[in-house]
UniProtKB/Swiss-Prot annotation:
Pfam short name (any one): Glyco_tran_28_C
Native source organism of the sequence: Anaeromyxobacter dehalogenans (strain 2CP-1 / ATCC BAA-258)
Pathway: Cell wall biogenesis; peptidoglycan biosynthesis
GO terms, molecular function: UDP-N-acetyl-D-glucosamine:N-acetylmuramoyl-L-alanyl-D-glutamyl-meso-2,6-diaminopimelyl-D-alanyl-D-alanine-diphosphoundecaprenol 4-beta-N-acetylglucosaminlytransferase activity; undecaprenyldiphospho-muramoylpentapeptide beta-N-acetylglucosaminyltransferase activity
This protein's name: UDP-N-acetylglucosamine--N-acetylmuramyl-(pentapeptide) pyrophosphoryl-undecaprenol N-acetylglucosamine transferase
Family, per entry: Belongs to the glycosyltransferase 28 family. MurG subfamily.
Catalysed transformations (reactions): di-trans,octa-cis-undecaprenyl diphospho-N-acetyl-alpha-D-muramoyl-L-alanyl-D-glutamyl-meso-2,6-diaminopimeloyl-D-alanyl-D-alanine + UDP-N-acetyl-alpha-D-glucosamine = di-trans,octa-cis-undecaprenyl diphospho-[N-acetyl-alpha-D-glucosaminyl-(1->4)]-N-acetyl-alpha-D-muramoyl-L-alanyl-D-glutamyl-meso-2,6-diaminopimeloyl-D-alanyl-D-alanine + UDP + H(+)
The keyword Ribosomal protein is annotated on this UniProt entry: no
């Protein structure tokens, strides 16, 4: 089976696509996955780094661009559809999955017109504009939150959760790493989050009495690293401040509490890794979807939410202290998070995709390929 994953822009769209691709290629040596995105999106760098091929199209978003900007970007669509048609003709995928972001629109619509089975994967509680539009034509809509189902026909909805990267799945099987002191993990996404970084520094004086009893690992992004490290030292903390955390699996396994944003991929990781959290939704997220995402964990008892307009150093310090000082509460939050986890999401989405392929092409392996044609796959780590 050959799958095409279309879309991207942010890690919240790209990483679930990579997680699904990892599942597909491990099922059969002839399976492969190709991505389609834009040169400006995160996919242009992280997809090749994951070992998958990527094709690029020229397209820009329409929402929030103003009338003039939207009209200019509309003029790019005919070219984007032509590029999509050429890519689809060249790769001949058996199924196309849109993961959100404006790059997915032309590819999924063109695939539908070519009678290739199509699906969308919606990561958030409020479906994005592109996925809402594509939902009218695709065969399946994979959702992670019950609230997202209202954007799609009921017969198309599969609420299976968000796929997470294979390395992070280790947390589902591995035990907690042993440590004596409470450990706090802070991050704002792959690029960091400036406002969150600043509020944590403001919280440190209110936690000064804990500096000998707490360990904090803080991912800041490149912009704030030096300033944040100085802030920790000024308050007497031994800093573990990093621009980027390469091994998030180990970071999750080694912490007792997480302070972070409320992107869908982050929440999927928190629930599979069974981590209590303090969530600070990104206020500029489209349709305020991070607040809706966070509420699902708050309502289940797995997290505390502080909206950024209410976030001060004192408020954040109080919440951190109350949770870290209450082991039984942390345990209850961890159990609640685990009940929301979907460790099988990638597998179950791949199962549905294979059924779509079987219905269209008569075999779960898809269309016949030319003799000698090698599948496009990431290199085998064992080789």
């Amino acid at each position: 089976m050959r799958m095409m994953v279309a879309g991207g822009g942010t890690g919240g769209h790209v990483f679930p696509g990579i997680a699904l691709a990892e599942e597909v290629v491990t099922r059969h040596p002839a399976n492969d996955v190709v991505f389609v995105g834009t040169a400006r999106g995160l996919e242009a760098s992280v997809v090749p780094a994951a070992g998958f091929p990527i094709e690029l199209i020229e397209v820009k978003g329409l929402k929030g661009k103003g009338i003039a900007g939207a009209l200019l970007n509309l003029l790019l669509l005919p070219r984007a559809f032509l590029q999509s048609w050429r890519i689809l003709r060249r790769w001949r995928p058996d199924v196309v999955v849109g993961v959100g972001g404006y790059a997915s629109g032309p590819v999924v619509l063109t695939a539908w017109a070519m009678r290739i089975p199509t699906a969308v994967q919606e990561q958030n509680a409020i479906a994005g504009l592109t996925n809402r539009l594509l939902g009218r034509v695709v065969k399946a809509a994979f959702t992670a939150f019950p609230e997202a189902a209202r954007h799609f026909a009921a017969r198309k909805v599969y609420q299976l959760g968000n796929p997470i990267r294979r390395r992070l799945m280790e947390n589902y099987m591995r035990p907690e790493s042993a440590h004596g002191q409470p450990r706090l993990l802070v991050f704002g996404g792959s690029q960091g989050a400036h406002a969150l970084n600043m509020r944590v520094i403001e919280a440190l004086p209110h936690l000064a009495d804990l500096r000998e009893r707490i360990q904090i690992t803080h991912q800041t992004g490149a912009r704030d690293r030096e300033y944040v490290e100085k802030g920790y030292r000024a308050c007497g903390f031994t800093p573990d401040v990093r621009e980027f955390i390469d091994d998030m699996s180990a970071a999750y396994a080694g912490c007792d509490l997480v302070v972070c944003r409320a992107g869908a991929t982050t929440l999927a990781e928190l629930t599979v890794c069974k981590k209590p959290s303090i969530l600070v939704p990104f206020p500029a997220a489209a349709d305020n979807h991070q607040v809706k995402n966070a509420r699902s964990l708050v309502d289940a008892g797995a997290a505390v939410m502080i909206e950024e307009r209410d976030l001060t150093g004192e408020v954040l310090a109080r919440e951190i202290r109350e949770i870290l000082d209450a082991p039984e509460r942390r345990e209850r939050m961890a159990r609640a998070a685990g009940r929301l986890g979907s460790p099988q999401a990638a597998k179950e989405i791949a199962d549905v995709c294979m059924e779509l392929v079987r219905r269209r092409w008569g075999s779960p392996f898809g269309q016949a390929r030319e003799p000698g044609q090698k599948p496009a796959r990431p290199p085998d780590p064992a080789s």
